[in-house]
Amino acid sequence: MIKAGIIGATGYAGAELVRILMNHKEVEIAWYGSRSYVDENYADIYGNMFQIVDAKCMDDNMEELAESVDVIFTATPQGFLAGVLTEDILSKVKIVDLSADFRIKDVATYEKWYKIEHKSPQFIDEAVYGLCEINRDKVTKETRLVANPGCYTTCSILTAYPLVKEGLIDTDTLIVDAKSGTSGAGRGAKTPNLFCEVNESMKAYGVASHRHTPEIEEQLGYAAGKEILINFTPHLVPMNRGIIATEYATLKKKPDGTLPTYDEIKAVYDKYYANEKFVRVLKKGVCPETKWVEGSNYVDVNFVIDERTGRIIMMGALDNLVKGAAGQAVQNMNLLFGFDEAEGLNMVPMFP
């Protein structure tokens, strides 16, 4: 049994960490960190935890926390962990960071897109990008710092990764159109996220400027073995949770001048995902739906070949708070400590 501390336990991703870890047989939550609710009962903030969690919220003192737990989850805004992380802290505890502070390897790129100065760039190189299905062999018991991928990025990367890796699409033509529920914007009160602003409406935002763009480009670039530039456009939709990504790219023709067939593309997806518990490649003609993955750690993917245009449409769906945040963080923790990778994550998707 290990002890875990959560900084940001009262945000949506932090609360989802609590929900998941409560059912993990190898973990005890020892620290419910929340700068906003210090000394308040956790169950008073989240009523669904009434008579389940009997603990008060604590502060975000990383130095003290590192002395008392085996792993820290930082479900915090960008800049928090980078601003407090020291070698002394990392020498005592493993950290899974749900922010973007250590996802992007180039400091200048991070500072350009997030518009803040990176306070601890000396730890970027050692941070492992924790997209388990791709970097599983790098998340080991020796790893100290895991950069948990973003929600849009997890969905976008896993949806296209097999075809990028195998060189079956022209990456210069890749377009990612993604839609997310409002929980992706966090729990803080913001006028654009009020019920009357969001209900019965959809909108694009961060057009040509969303900060998950360089993260997607960097990871798919590693897969392709070259620099990649994409068009990424996110949209806000009036639902609580879920992300769906629809991605478009031109298929590369085979030597005989014909397009790859459905069976050939399906074989590529199966090559990468047939043995992945949390990635489900759907049957032919079935399009992913956010409702099918809600509350779970699954990613559903599929594709359609448009022979008329020579393009392929790739689709993916996940729960932004689970596989897009807390579930993936627990998956990484399991790898860090040598637990069964699926421990605590065998949640059946909720429906309806």
Feature annotation, model-predicted:
Residues 22-26, 165-169, 210, 218-225, ...:
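Generic secondary-structure signature for well-ordered alpha-helical cores
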Residues 209-232, 236-240, 244-246:
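Oxyanion-binding "anion nests"
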Residues 143, 202, 242-246, 311-313:
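Short, solvent-exposed beta-strand edge segments and adjacent coil->beta transition regions
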Residues 1-200, 205-207, 304-307, 348-352:
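N-terminal Rossmann-like NAD(P) cofactor-binding subdomain of oxidoreductases
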Residues 12, 126, 154-158, 207-215, ...:
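Conserved active-site and cofactor/substrate-binding residues in soluble primary-metabolism enzymes
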